[in-house]
Amino acid sequence: LKPKTPALAIILITVTLIIVVASLNWPRPPDENPEFYVGVEVAYTNTNVSDVRAMVDKVKSYTNLFVIGSVELTYNETTLNESCDYIYNNGLKIIILFTNVFNYSYDTHEWLSKAQQKYGDGFLGLYRYDEPGGDQLENPRSRFVQNATTYTEAASEFTEILRAHVDYYVDSVGNIFTADFGLYWWSYKTNYDAIFAEFVGNQSRQRHIAMCRGAAAAHGKEWGTIITWKYDNEPYFENGQELYQDLRLAYTSGAKYIIIFNFPKIGPYGTMTDEHFDALKQFWDHTKANPQDFGSTKANVAYVLPPHYGFGLRRPDDSIWGIFPPDELSTKAWNDVSMLVDKYGAGFDVLFDDEDLGDVRNRYNQVFFWNQTIA
């Protein structure tokens, strides 16, 4: 039997190598519980603790996040504490909005420190400075940059001023968030940990996903979506079927945070009615049954715009940085992105060719630049 031993050893080694190689290359099952959060932001004017409790009771079995977006509630430390206690005790994660520091009668830094000790990982972080990019694009009274001679100057000034607002709390809380509908790239250059792309009106959801997700990827950050008004008057919010489709789109596109913006209080639960709660529950059930759908729409294509090009990308004649008119590239950029939406849906990202682009372009199978023809 001895002469056969070397041959047997060779066979065993070969089989072992095959098993090892196969295990390394065999497709791994998707994460059974991908880390993502879905919930409602209660932002009614003069929200009280009873409003918070009512909404928590309504959605706690099919959400895992609650956002306190009513600044009046946060002005009062007692009502804020009562609200957060109730949210936490019902198993939901917490995000709160803080606004102008001079409106608070208590030390907000101290409150954040205590909240993190008290709620642990149940406190996700702070929502700080709403829509900085959107304000720059369309709100003259709130623009950080009122005058600039070049796109480069506007980009630098915008980022510098916004960073000061974000950094006010950067040492007091683990995560800082905002929601926006433009200029994501430059907001991510500050210390925001995640930005929620707004699904608003009839604006292309895929376009905003491409801009927000692309910026997050380039800066090593997270991203999310927030579903806001469809109409400027009642009923304000989209119908239940549209909500379900938006929730599904955000989930398959890989949004870590998915939030429903709820304002004003035109009914017992704000702008939300039974059809919206039914859609939210249906979505929750879908995520539990289909965790493999999370992030299943991959961004395999990238579209790269010039550095510092703060084009709003909401229409072909949108402004640049809110202070410059559209230029010779604007219509082409709009048409290019629209063509990519038609062809790839949410399967592409928008990037900018500055120092933060780096090797991120290597993640994509195909990269188009602004000066190329897209067929």
Model-inferred region functions:
Residues L1-T16, V20-N25:
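N-terminal Sec-pathway targeting helices
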Residues T5, S23-A375:
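Glycan-processing catalytic domains of CAZymes
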